[in-house]
């Protein structure tokens, strides 16, 4: 990596040069982000995963820039256009935009109006006009060019009049203005700073595009438009219902060009002015609009991806129930409830279908089936999917008078149907149908959400915002980073983990993970981390990256169950020897751990950060960083939207956090929306600062729209209630006030349109 890149990244991220340089070297050596953050703190100055990821991404961006720079230099050199001055300009371009602006005048292009004008011999006239000499008479100077013609590809172009000659000369000037780097920079800033995003309805699409009705005639400054509104407008355009533009005030755009290129008010200057007008309308304006739209689309994508990634992290790190014998129930009315019995390792032991809601006799049979499984297999928990018939099934189970020690927990079904039809599920359960696989997934999600959710494409989990509209490559990378981060943060039990979970461990991939599982199945459980080196395809580098994140209970070495890396076993052995005890004694005796003098073990490679991590691991080897599991129950007697009344205070769980608010499951088969204005009594700029996916809340029902099954909730201490049914012609005032039309309340920012239909569609898609 070039030294000037290190300096640039240092300045951009506010880090020390040595931190950036060390991280760059480690990444180049093949180290992963989790490994660097956990086991190379001394080299990086204790950078965290976020900082390391930022360095990694910026390095890749700068390397891409350098590749493009070399390509441009090569192209210019081959065409004998590369001067020392131009080489210096290309070399100094700090961004891809600046680089492309420099290259634009020299870029091979298709035949344009300007090239045709040049072929007609009008370039000398354009130069004369460009000079804007007050003594120049444009029409007089143009007269000698009348009648010029050129034939290209059997097509003849001719300038027959003075007006056509001047128009051709202006075409040359317009392209010259368009290619000017200063003009492009000036206009780019104007479009970004003062551009207005406008959307209008495509004629005849009122009914089809009703969900975008808020945008049928809408405009706002692009610089302050929330990401979800930009994405909503773009979605409406993509679906053919909206026409959108992003432009600054035209007078300012023209004024910028006039200021750069027009000198005075002579006839020649007027020709340059007309060329500026044409350039803005036909060339530069279009180009800058595309750039500005791309800029704000990327910005909106980044925000939406960040929201998705934050939500996914919270979901993956949700509290696990742990290894308990569990019943997983996928509820249903007509087709019955699919029940599976899982042992403490999540292995499927039995399955059957019960029909608790069809008749008294079948309900008794269902009760007997559940009670028998609980009694015979000593069931410790029951997981119920939160889809159709979930509350009814929960009520049925709770009527069985089960021991209070058995937790009955509602579990999100989001993505379960996708898993049940996946190749992974077919491999795991080739002899069982979709319904059984789905119920297994529900039960396992309660036991260990992380281990089960890694089997899904993160995009199918349902905690995103406009996830199908954003840059899919960027989304995938961000979500993959989150999954890798979470898996390695928690650590993986080597002898029980699935190959799907192992594949996300630092240093491993799907191939080496499959080899690990195959070796385990053939030779029995791993007895030590050192055995990993016997795996085909897993060399010393992969071992270095992976070993610390893999745990072996009751392994050959007492530290195999901890996050202490094998490269530090010798150090811990020395600590124990210096105290006259064993490593096992250090694990068991707090007094002995307290007696360790860390300063004695500091070396250039091992500093206090690593030593403190080691001692922390000795205190709680292999500790799970996830919070302790706490059972949650919805309010009894409130099982469907029709049961709700304004003013009810209900327990709920946050299921999705977006830029405009959060969705909360209150147990009625339909998530309610807590608009950003109703999250807190304090001002809320970013909902994610106040709420997380999986967070338990007490929500107040504000309004209910029964026909459309929409629920408005509030988390504020003082709530102004709306109607139970939608009312037209509300009283106005602040959003959510009593008597105001419900759909109007759901608009953004006190009346600014949002995509209410899209928002609620997101929630409705979660619940069958």
What are these regions (language model features)?
Residues 189-196, 329-333, 387-392, 411-418, ...:
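A glycine-rich phosphate-binding loop feature that marks nucleotide/adenosyl-phosphate handling sites
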Residues 85, 98, 102, 409, ...:
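Long, charge-rich intrinsically disordered scaffolds of nucleic-acid metabolism proteins
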Residues 48-54, 61-328, 334-432, 439, ...:
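Duplex nucleic acid-engaging cores and interfaces of nucleic-acid transaction enzymes
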Residues 14, 319-321, 484-518, 636-672, ...:
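C-terminal accessory/binding modules appended to enzymatic or scaffolding proteins
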Residues 552-768:
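Single-stranded RNA-binding regions, centering on S1/OB-family and related RNA-binding modules
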Residues 292-309, 425, 460-491, 600-646:
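Long, charged amphipathic helices and adjacent flexible linkers at domain junctions
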Residues 32-33, 44, 48-152, 156, ...:
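Accessory alpha-helical DNA-binding modules that contact the DNA backbone or grooves
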